Amino acid sequence: MSPVSVISLPSDLCLPTSFIDRSGRELNPLHITIPNVAMRRQGKLMTRASMSVNLRTAVSDDAVIRRRGDFHSNLWDDDFIQSLSSHYGEPSYRERAERLIGEVKNSFNSVSNEDGESITPLDDLIQRLWMVDSVERLGIDRHFKKEIKSALDHVYSYWSEKGIGCGRESVVTDLNSTALGLRTLRLHGYDVSAEVLNHFKNQSGQFACTLKQTEDQIRTVLNLYRASLIAFPGEKVMDEAETFSAKYLKDALQKIPVSSLSREIGDVLEYGWHTYLPRLEARNYIDVFGQDTENSKSYMKTEKLLELAKLEFNIFHALQKRELEYLVRWWKGSGSPQMTFCRHRHVEYYTLASCIAFEPQHSGFRLGFAKACHIITVLDDMYDTFGTLDELELFTSAIKRWDPSATECLPEYMKGVYMIVYNTVNEMSQEADKAQGRDTLNYCRQAWEEYIDAYMQEAKWIASGEVPTFEEYYENGKVSSGHRVSALQPILTTDIPFPEHVLKEVDIPSKLNDLASAILRLRGDTRCYQADRARGEEASCISCYMKDNPGTTEEDALNHINAMISDVIKGLNWELLKPNSSVPISAKKHAFDISRAFHYGYKYRDGYSVASIETKSLVKRTVIDPVTL
């Protein structure tokens, strides 16, 4: 390890400082004034910005002055997790749910046997779409895959270049049915063109809607907005539909009374689609479903759907409690609580996983994602702040050896980090091997090695203060974003087969992986660049863009990055939903949804460094609290 050298600064610098020993254990914190002292990493000056008051520094027992992020501690302690209780795991609730599933299936099937009263050839298409949309938004669609396909096949058989009407015998097409059909069919991989929406414009090129904002009219525009969010690259009409419908709905919210409809509109405008995690949507939709005119007019009794949705939500809640208890035991057993230099967000990561994958059989995915993200966070804080460049180079080499004996050359605190990476990656590979029927360790190790290399590059930029070109930073940043390593092993533990040709369409070199990694890097940087800069991490998408384009402002850079994000989202939509793909949507959905989960975490701010109100609310609404039956 190279010695720490000191140089003079022009004025005294007061730093909130903690003492930390070699194992990473925090000693008594205190404030001291360090006169005229700054640190060099590997002979490179760390600027005053890197020693700002947003960062705590610490002197370890080997006299190394370490940078340390000022992060709050774990919010969900062991006692709290153990105090959670649920009786919804009892067999009687599962039996009750199974009876309701059978009744709802009968309701689905009754659509095919039209009685001329509750459903007719004049409304059979919209009824089918409403049914599919309802079970999906309530989070119970996994029970009705066969019925959903049958319903959508029927709707698609009547789809035309001008859209559809409410029923197969409708004389004219209908914007509400067409918008809901476009969205629902596209989400299931049917080949439907957005150009169909052009047929609902007037001579001025505007979407034809009456000025009078009736409930039916508002719902039509709401479905138009929801459809516009499932846009593919180059679809101008979808951009126009989104702009028009968003403005219309915001205006409507100012005029209509507070109601289930206004809450539904507010939720959809707030989350859109890419950050509206399925379990969160189910939790919110349960609160409003069955309270509006549209649902009460439906041929299907909403009470059955609502009761089933609540039961399924709470039955999964009981499983979440058991999985959380296991996760906390793993976290403690791994030695993570002693790693005081890093963030501990394993409960938040588990919450994100359970919001995108709440099928009971995907326990391995949820726990694997939480573990992988915890490791990523530990490594992030070690490479970005706590470790010295010499130490990080040793750690990077040790990871590539993949042998516990490689820890002999590491500082004490790094030995614990190494072993949690080594043990957890090996354990997750064993689970993946069982699911996939082949060895996966070497393939997954390669992904982790590339990830560590990308971190090492960033550590060198931090040490030197270098701001690379945007392209260089962006390509490295997509790897260091961690999307690939957070997704790879968890998806391999599912019951979905991933032969080599399928894996290539989800992992590298797929466009899906590239775009999912891109959105995490781009959105993460827009939320973190100021705090990172205060810690001495100068390189970001924003700073690199400004360097490449002299004279541009931060606002210019942010506008450019946000435009890139919009394009990336459309590209992701296409990679997931493109028709006639050789890889089914089900094989790509988990990796895609992981990008949605990370995007949610950065929706308002950096929700990983600081557990925001929104993050805490997500944990409470989707994991901690059951719904009232």
Swiss-Prot record:
GO terms for molecular function: magnesium ion binding; pinene synthase activity; terpene synthase activity. A motif (DDXXD motif) lies at residues 380-384. The keyword Metal-binding applies. PANTHER family: OS04G0344100 PROTEIN-RELATED. The Asp-Asp-Xaa-Xaa-Asp/Glu (DDXXD/E) motif is important for the catalytic activity, presumably through binding to Mg(2+). Belongs to the terpene synthase family. Tpsd subfamily. This is (-)-alpha pinene synthase 1, chloroplastic. It comes from Pinus contorta (Shore pine).
